[in-house]
Amino acid sequence: MNVEVGEECIRFAKVIRYFTLAGLILLVVSSAMYLLDIDPFVEPDRVVETWHLPASEFWKVNVGKEMESYSEFLYIAHPDNVAVFSLFFLALAPVFALLSILPKMKGIYRILTILVVAELLFGAVRPLILGAIGE
């Protein structure tokens, strides 16, 4: 029995696969660099000691300054921040996959796809909009 799979489903799956693969490679490489103590933003030994602290105190103790939401991306040259970025990249994979099939969607499906993309994007940037600091 053959099952027909729509072109948009294949496109969605390919985009998810490529973004997931790229994100996981980025995560594994940056995590390995961090564990090997190659230019970390937060020293690995200090993370264990201070992990229980609220986010604002954690950043003050480990970095010496307050950090706002997503401000670790300003220090993207450090492998531990690249690991955080790779998680953000992985979280956006469905957004890019949905955007890739949007031209093929028609009627109510197009509207629903736009709503899902908007919800995912709002969830990603909500801390920036609301000024939260991750606590």
Curated annotation (Swiss-Prot):
The chain crosses the membrane at residues 13-35, 82-101, 108-130. It is a multi-pass membrane protein. GO terms for cellular component: plasma membrane. It is found in: Cell membrane. Keywords: Cell membrane, Membrane, Transmembrane, Transmembrane helix. It comes from the Archaea. The keyword Cell membrane applies. This is Uncharacterized protein AF_0123. It comes from Archaeoglobus fulgidus (strain ATCC 49558 / DSM 4304 / JCM 9628 / NBRC 100126 / VC-16).
